[in-house]
Amino acid sequence: MSSVKRTPKQEIVTQFHCSAAEGDIAKLTGILSHSPSLLNETSENGWTALMYAARNGHPEIVQFLLEKGCDRSIVNKSRQTALDIAVFWGYKHIANLLATAKGGKKPWFLTNEVEECENYFSKTLLDRKSEKRNNSDWLLAKESHPATVFILFSNLNPLVTLGGNKESFQQPEVRLCQLNYTDIKDYLAQPEKITLIFLGVELEIKDKLFNYAGEVPREEEDGLVAWFALGIDPIAAEEFKQRHENCYFLHPPMPALLQLKEKEAGVVAQARSVLAWYSRYKFCPTCGNATKIEEGGYKRVCLKEDCPSLNGVHNTSYPRVDPVVIMQVIHPDGTKCLLGRQKRFPPGMFTCLAGFIEPGETIEDAVRREVEEESGVKVGHVQYVACQPWPMPSSLMIGCLALAVSTEIKVDKNEIEDAHWFTREQVLDVLTKGKQQAFFVPPSRAIAHQLIKHWIRINPNL
């Protein structure tokens, strides 16, 4: 700081800047309370109080000035912002405070590219062929086609049989029981007792269609193998199991559904979500009257002639999807992540924080709100990574990275049981050694696991 005689204004600016440079929060607060216009004042070299705090490594001063609304975009005579200064001098925590405040720049350690990935439950064997849902004649013909595949459900649990392989997560692999018309024709004869959903057609044309050339009229053969989900009641399900001892209904949903082959899991995710909607909305949500099923199981139509739901398009008439944000919260210095646990979790399991998006809320704001509600940690920059259908019963998990701008954890016991910052080394040990460690994370087929791995992969030298 120069010792040249200054004007009264220059003197107070100098004192303000000195208090920021020295980390004197009490003095800084006092000066600013009397002279709030000093917040963005610059010295002769173009430096602001924020720059001095960033240069000397005072995160509490930086946080205070940011909360007061100081301008982070000001550049000094060397064309540096406060963020540039913090990065140059190696103050990672401060650099991220400056970069991750809402509306700020992307944190310096995040990559610009996020590779698109397919998570478990998102792969499928089928083309949904939604244009066929209104073609009742086509659907009826496919129901009795000998090549058509039916997958059976009871209480939302799919009928499966054990497969012969094991995968890396050490769970026995199970496969869907793919039934044909002969297996289930008695159920189709009692439509009032079943739920039938058209799922789509196989993506690959199979030679087996040619085996039925004599059984199907030539004009009805289009080369498409249709799949349907068939929901039956528990009594019928028990009778079916007794006749097919090598099959069983997969239960409980978690973690049992994670044992399916990946493409079959995508089919189950679709079927289970629609069947869950069907079981929960048997009556019109608008007027309470009975409904009928149309569009291959994808629409409920009210039977009351003057019901408002019959005028226009209403989301109450179609299967619902519940958007959920799930986020890997990263410490401001980039070297730790925030994981939490709920009481219902297995002992020792920690995972990413998550929560439902509220009406009128963006993905980014939902991330910030949920993290603060559950852990007390404030979040700035949010970056989308990937999503995953989650049929429990019909959620869409929207996976994000979330950069914390505060570090103190204040757990809301009504939301979660516990939360901690975990170092990169701790998380790496868990991913490589599993449950041998003091804690563990969800299995690889859950998006939480993939978000954690994604964080580990970015800037591995941090």
UniProtKB/Swiss-Prot annotation:
Question: Which EC number(s) are documented for this chain?
Answer: 3.6.1.-, 3.6.1.22
Reaction(s) catalyzed by this protein? Answer: a 5'-end NAD(+)-phospho-ribonucleoside in mRNA + H2O = a 5'-end phospho-adenosine-phospho-ribonucleoside in mRNA + beta-nicotinamide D-ribonucleotide + 2 H(+); NAD(+) + H2O = beta-nicotinamide D-ribonucleotide + AMP + 2 H(+); NADH + H2O = reduced beta-nicotinamide D-ribonucleotide + AMP + 2 H(+); NADPH + H2O = reduced beta-nicotinamide D-ribonucleotide + adenosine 2',5'-bisphosphate + 2 H(+)
Per UniProt, the cofactor note for this protein states: Binds 3 Mg(2+) ions per subunit. Binds 1 zinc ion per subunit.
Any idea which positions bind Mg(2+) 3?
Answer: 370, 374, 415
Q: Which residues carry this modification: N6-succinyllysine?
A: 185, 292
Q: What are the binding positions for substrate in this chain? A: 318, 354-356, 370, 374, 415
Membrane-spanning regions, if any?
none
- Record SUPFAM superfamilies: Ankyrin repeat, Nudix
ANK repeat start-end pairs: 11-40, 45-74, 78-98
Keyword check for rRNA processing, yes or no.
Answer: no
Which residues bind Mg(2+) 1 per the record?
A: 354, 374, 415
GO annotation, cellular component aspect: cytosol; peroxisome
Q: Where in the cell is it found?
A: Cytoplasm; Peroxisome; Cytoplasmic granule
Keywords annotated in UniProt: ANK repeat, Cytoplasm, Hydrolase, Magnesium, Metal-binding, NAD, NADP, Peroxisome, Repeat, Zinc
Sequence positions that bind Mg(2+) 2: 370
- State how it assembles: Homodimer. Homodimerization is essential for its catalytic activity and protein stability. Interacts (via ANK repeats) with BLMH.
Protein family: Belongs to the Nudix hydrolase family. NudC subfamily.
Its job: mRNA decapping enzyme that specifically removes the nicotinamide adenine dinucleotide (NAD) cap from a subset of mRNAs by hydrolyzing the diphosphate linkage to produce nicotinamide mononucleotide (NMN) and 5' monophosphate mRNA. The NAD-cap is present at the 5'-end of some RNAs; in contrast to the canonical N7 methylguanosine (m7G) cap, the NAD cap promotes mRNA decay. Preferentially acts on NAD-capped transcripts in response to nutrient stress. Also acts on free nicotinamide adenine dinucleotide molecules: hydrolyzes NAD(H) into NMN(H) and AMP, and NADPH into NMNH and 2',5'-ADP.
Which protein, by its recorded name, is this? NAD-capped RNA hydrolase NUDT12
Q: Which gene encodes it?
A: NUDT12
